[in-house]
Amino acid sequence: MKSYTKMVAGVVVAACTIFVSACGGGTTSNGEGGSSASGNAANNAALTVTDVQGREVSFDKQPERIILAEGRGVFATSILDKDKPFDKVVARGSDLKTAAPSFYEELEKAVPETKDIPEIGNMAKGDVTVENLLSYNPDVVVMTADHYKASETNGMLTKMDDAGIKYVVTDFRQHPLTNTTKSIELLGKIFDKEDKAEAFNKDWTDTVDRVKETAAKADKKPKTFLWRAAGWNDC
């Protein structure tokens, strides 16, 4: 039973690492908001990234104007820069206040400019317009896999492609064990914070490996249920 208890504890740690790091900077941040050394050297160089959908997106220079289509993307950007999680962000999704009200209140206290970031609506609900996105002159829109699927269905992706709006896809929900590190690596390149992304991914991978090793040694493996998003009816 002790082995099983350790296994469950490890799973919880692995599942929550990204959110804990987002709130406090975790062990991956040195408290400085500067760009990575490698990023500074190539700040004006061309950049090509691959998102979780396997799409390659190229930029003539380092993106400077970024839209977080999901406001909760700040959980991840806080890992890259806990002092300035909205650095380079010109607009964000409207979900942050409603989906994570307690987090939003604390974030607003720690980062006062949070309240000044314009909201674009919710891409998953289809209430975002191309005209609104264009008004912020973005270099790239960061959307989730949920947004990507919804926008593909309702024709928003076609409209964005026609308007020349570049976008990349992240995923921390649908396949977290596969796509968490891919998403952080992607954001590290987009936000020019590759060193912070690499540090977090190492910590994440080490934690997941420990969980797997503990689980493999467990004598009893009863079925468990982890309520990932307490309070949400569709969970």
Regions found by a protein language model. Give the residues of each.
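Bacterial N-terminal signal peptides that target proteins for export
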Residues: 1-11
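C-terminal motif of bacterial Sec signal peptides marking the signal peptidase cleavage site
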Residues: 18-22
